[in-house]
Amino acid sequence: MIDIILNDSGGTIMESLELRIFREVARTKSISKSAENMGYVQSNITAHIKKLERELNTTLFIRHSKGVTLTKDGEKLLYQAEKIISLLDKTLKSFQNHPKTLKIGTTQTIAGYLLPQCIIEYQKQFPNVLLSVSTLDQDDLEQKLSNGQLDCIITNNSHNICYGKQILNSPENLVLITPSSCHSQKDIWKYPVIINSIESCPYRKVLLGWWNLHQSELPKMIELDTVEAILNTVAMGGGISLLPQVVLLDKQNINSFYIESLQSTSIHMWVATDKLPSEYIALKDIIQKQLKIDNN
């Protein structure tokens, strides 16, 4: 990297490379030794020193048979060069140490069952990336993606997002969950339907749509805010619900039924239109791999 030092009027005075070469020559008192240390040919070192002397309109070194010695102006420049180079190096280091952030938006359900293992795996591969996960409803996710507050969103809503690029579309297995006392699909209809209180929730839409295809009367509905609340209520005999199969791992007092006529859902990953999709391929691959594991 070559840093440019400007004067007050914006004109170029010198490049930091010239200052670094000047400092090395001042330290070694030798053009040849400086060239060796910095990996340049001697003529290149000499050319940079002469260019610097022309820009400053002064002589910086006295040449003699044993090497070079700083002039008074050379000593003055060395003092300033040390400070300038130190400041440039600190500035560069501060940017290099500034952690890259990845701001992810998703639904509460996906954040709870899919992302934890994916985040662990991503951090193993990219330990210097700071991850931030926000759980929002679908409308808020799209809005924050469009205004730059999120880098990518992971959702199971299938409609297109005009200001995003889709890089993942992978199916998820859904199952109808019932209390353990429900041993047959014929018994399902006697239970209340437990759904997420957010109307845009895909599982809610699929479950109610399926119910309305098979029953003339609307179900008794219980609306809850969290997946955990839905699971606990089903386990205690309070009703039936629809959730991804993986959510049921190690859950007791719950039966599950796979019903072919239920409309499926998919996990979609969208990145903002001003982002490079290639930067998010690693996260996409991890999510896709985890979905394959979960769906088996």
Predicted regions and their residues:
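Short helix-boundary/capping micro-motifs
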Residues: 23-41
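Central regulatory/effector-binding core of bacterial HTH transcription factors
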Residues: 99-161, 223-224
